Each structure stands twice: as C-alpha cells, then as structure tokens.
Amino acid sequence: MLRDLHRVLATIIAFLFISMMGVAYRYRYPMQASSSPHPEPLLVCRPKTNIVFLKTHKCASSTLMNIFLRYGMRHDLNFVLPKSTFTHYIGHPTPFRRTLIDDITKYNMTFNILTHHTRYDGKEMHKVMPPDTVYVTILRRPDCLFESLYSYCHLADSYKKNLSAFVEDKKLTRALTRKRALEGRVGFNQMSYDLGFNGLLRSKPESITNFINSIDRAFDLVMITERLDESLILLKHLLCWNTSDVVAFKVNARYAEYKEELSADLKKKLSDLNHADVLLYRHFAELFERKVREFGADRMAAEVQELQAARKAYYAKCVEAEQSLDVVSTKLKRKDVVAFKMKDKSEECRHLTMSELDFHELVKAKQKERINRLQHSRTSR
C-alpha cells in the first residue's frame, strides 16, 4: 500500500515539475492492460506533433486526414505540401521525393505533419521529417476497397463494364495489371502500391513477405478501417492526444445506393486479383487484434463509447443536414459522396465538415501566410 502511494506521489511530483517548465504534458495509463492487483501508475506523456500519415486510397483515409489537418491547424504546425499548384497529391505514382514539396526549411521552418496522398518512400521521408516522427497508416479489406475504388474512380466508364463483368474479363484484368489506371495511380493491390510495393500481381511470396515485414518495422501503428473507432483510440494513446482530437465525421464516403453488393464469388475473385493486399491486410489485422487485446477489452469499450458520444455531440452542434458533395464543395462535383451542411459557423465546425480539397486549399493558404509573416518580421528588424 505504501509502495503504491509512493508511486502515485512520484508521478504527481514529476508532472508538477515539468508543468513548471511550461511544456504541455498529459496523464496516460499504459497502453497495455495489466493483470497486476496493484494499480498502474499514471504515465506522463507529451503530445506528439511530428507525424506521417500514409494516406491509402479508399480506406477512410480522408477521415483520418481531416483529423491531422485540424490538429495541425489548431496548433500552428507545418505541413508537407505539394509544390504543384494543380493537384493535392505529392507525386503518385512517383514515390515521395523532396523535390516534389514546398521547401519550408529555407525559412528555418521544420516539417511536422505529412498527410497528403503520396507513395511511401521511407528514406526520402526521413530526409524531411524530424527523427522523432510517428508513422501511421490504415488498411481495409481488399475486396471492399477495390469495389469502392472501381466506383469512386469511375472505372466502369473507362472499361465499359460494371465490376462483376470487369472481373470476368481476363483481357481487361490483365490490362489493369500491366498498366494502372488514372495516370498510374490506381489498380490492383492498391494499398501495397500506396505503401511503396512495385511487385506484379503474382509476385514471389518472399518478395511480398519482405515488403510486409518492412512496413511492420517502419510504422508505429497500422489502423484497420473495419475497426475505425478502436483504431482511433489506439491512435489517441500513441500520440498522447485527447478524445476531441480524434473526433471526425466520415469524409468522402459514398451513399449506400452507389455501393455494389459483393457476392461470395466476386469477393473471392477480387481477393485473387489483390493477392498482395490480402496478405498485407491479414498480417496487420492480426497484429491489430493483439494490440486491442493488450489494451484491454473493458477499457477499449469504455473509450470507444466516450469517442462515439463526443462525435454525436459534435454532429448535433455542427451539422444541419447531410448533402451530396456537389452541393457543398467548391472543388468536387460528386453526387455520390456524402457531405455536410453546417449548422454552427464556428471554425471548429467548419473544419470538421470541410471537404478534403477545400481543406487542402485552406491549409496551403494559411501556411503561405505564415511564411510571409516570418519573412516580413525578418526584413523589418
């Protein structure tokens, strides 16, 4: 009993000391649940601000991107942004390169968050991101992902066939295997491709295994779309953020009427065509389950409930109605995508309901303003 009291007192004293230093720290329980009869001491952690979120296509990654953009805007952090003025992609299909981004280091500024679409290249990213950067990404069931990709990217218009007919056409599937669609950006094994894998449909098993192991070593957390709320809880604790920081509405989600129901046969054929993605997803889905178990079932359930309550409260405050994206956004004319009509006009609600492209434009403008202020202050000295 006395030993437990000493541990608690030591934690409080440490927290008071670092608080006096003017640094924002927070209490956190350990990530892994403990079976010990003694109470676990509260950990003191500092919120992480240097983050790479590798955005994977059609994996709820736009929802995650909204979280990182909001956090960065709120804390005046610096984003890795494309040099190009006509796309919000950084390269892709070209992998990430320093030459593709706005170089803010020449203004003695440091990059904090990379969350825009790009293809993973760890060596190049390490050259621009701080050493303590946290790397995260998200994966989705490959059959569901490809259905979403085929619909969202209007591949039925390109191939003149719906998804079921396309999968049966070996000539068309071979063509997409040889040459990816939309200027090389989308195709089979999309998640593996986004994460830097260059293998063909039937790559040697060892090359896929080596690729998966390299991603396992490089990333601190791989989230799972089908377990999004639990993923957000693990993300919250990894980054030492608050629940409100990881609240988000679904961004770029399609209306149900635009989704194709997948038969068991179609699921199998899509899995065969996305073999590398199936192995990638299986590995990290199993790893995710272990992380959730280590976190503790009761603890996870309580935190998910807290997150859902917070999301519901923000939705009631911020959203008057759901509308199609073509009504809300100035950038995308999409009738199949859900967007939000704001109720509350606060900045917080504006950012929560903002479309991806509109948010990109806002972030780019704000960062340019920050650079201009910095240059002005230096020249006026």
Model region roles, listed by residue range:
Residues 38, 85-138, 143-247, 269, ...:
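PAPS-dependent sulfotransferase catalytic domain
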Residues 117, 210, 244-354:
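PAPS-dependent sulfotransferase catalytic core
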Residues 31-100, 109-111:
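Signal-peptide-cleavage-adjacent N-terminal segments of secreted and extracellular proteins
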Residues 60, 141, 277:
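Short, conserved catalytic/metal-binding motifs centered on acidic residues
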Residues 60, 65, 69, 147, ...:
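Amphipathic alpha-helical interaction motifs in eukaryotic regulatory proteins
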Residues 3, 10, 14, 18, ...:
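Long, hydrophobic alpha-helical transmembrane bundles and adjoining juxtamembrane helices/loops
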